[in-house]
Design a protein with these regions (language model features):
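A short beta-loop-beta micro-motif enriched in histidine and acidic residues
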Residues: 36-39, 51-67, 82-85
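Histidine-centered metal-chelating micro-motifs
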Residues: 57, 75-77, 95-96, 100-107
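Glycine- and acidic-residue-biased ligand/ion/polar-headgroup-sensing regions
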Residues: 65-76, 93
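Conserved short histidine dyad/triad with adjacent acidic residue
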Residues: 10, 25-31, 43-62
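Single conserved hydrophobic/aromatic residue that forms the stacking wall/gate
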Residues: 141-149
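Short acidic-glycine-tyrosine-enriched beta hairpin
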Residues: 83-96
Length: 149
């Protein structure tokens, strides 16, 4: 068994809103041109940040996937059609969207914020028949610590 290392130059780049939100995608979509493709249940993997301004990724739909977002820096705001309200997530917080039969959501990245997002395919043929759900966990409820190297 060999291990392949995919450096930043091998990863796909992405952006929203004319570059207000930037992305580096170790595993992106086929049209993104990255060298690493979806593997097993891991479908998408991206690091996104808003370097200069607050910026919104508009309301858009998902079906089937389970989407985990980790707030690495700053704050983001999340809206979805299940909650029907905006909520704020801060550094260290985690949200999980189980898209199931379908859910639409929007994210607002605040200036200087960063997120890490992973999409899983739990078994798309079954998950398309499950009701969607949303959950968020505050960093204060997670058992973790930061190590400075």
């Amino acid at each position: 068994m060999s291990i392949n290392i995919f450096k930043k130059d091998d990863q796909a780049n992405g952006h929203f809103n004319n570059g207000e939100i930037l992305e580096k995608k170790p595993i992106g979509f086929p049209q993104d041109g990255g060298k690493l493709k979806p593997y097993s249940n891991l479908f998408y993997w991206a690091h996104a940040w808003a370097p200069l301004n607050d910026s919104i990724i508009g309301l858009h739909p998902h079906r089937g996937f389970e989407i985990c977002s980790f707030v690495l820096k700053g704050e983001i705001e999340h809206y979805d059609t299940l909650l029907d309200k905006w909520i704020t997530l801060s550094k260290g917080d985690v949200q999980v969207i189980k898209a199931g039969k379908g859910i639409s959501h929007s994210e607002k990245l605040k200036k200087g914020s960063e997120i890490f997002q992973i999409w899983f395919d739990p078994n798309i043929q079954e998950s398309l028949y499950i009701d969607p759900s949303y959950s968020a966990v505050s960093y204060t409820h997670l058992r973790a610590h930061e190590t400075v190297v």
